[in-house]
Amino acid sequence: MISRFCLLFLLVFVVSKIQAAEDFNEENEVDDLDDLDFLDDLDLDLSPEELEYLENWVKEFED
């Protein structure tokens, strides 16, 4: 009886950890998409070409 309870507890614990890890990864993917949003807040006079260059540079760096 106690061993069944321990196995059930362990199973629930592992499943909850896996779910938390998946949620964390999804949040990080969303954050990665917004990495260059701070450039808009800096009020820099970047041309669209310069902004595109920076975005491409970040994409190449991530690969």
Curated annotation (Swiss-Prot):
GO cellular component, one term: extracellular region
Signal peptide: 1-20
Known tissue expression: Expressed by the venom gland.
Coiled coil location: none
Domain of life: Eukaryota
Keywords: Secreted, Signal
Compartments in which it is found: Secreted
Main location per the UniProt record: secreted
Record keyword Disulfide bond present: no
Family label: Belongs to the non-disulfide-bridged peptide (NDBP) superfamily. Long chain multifunctional peptide (group 2) family.
Record's protein name: Anionic peptide NDBP7
Organism: Lychas mucronatus
Lineage start: Eukaryota, Metazoa, Ecdysozoa, Arthropoda, Chelicerata
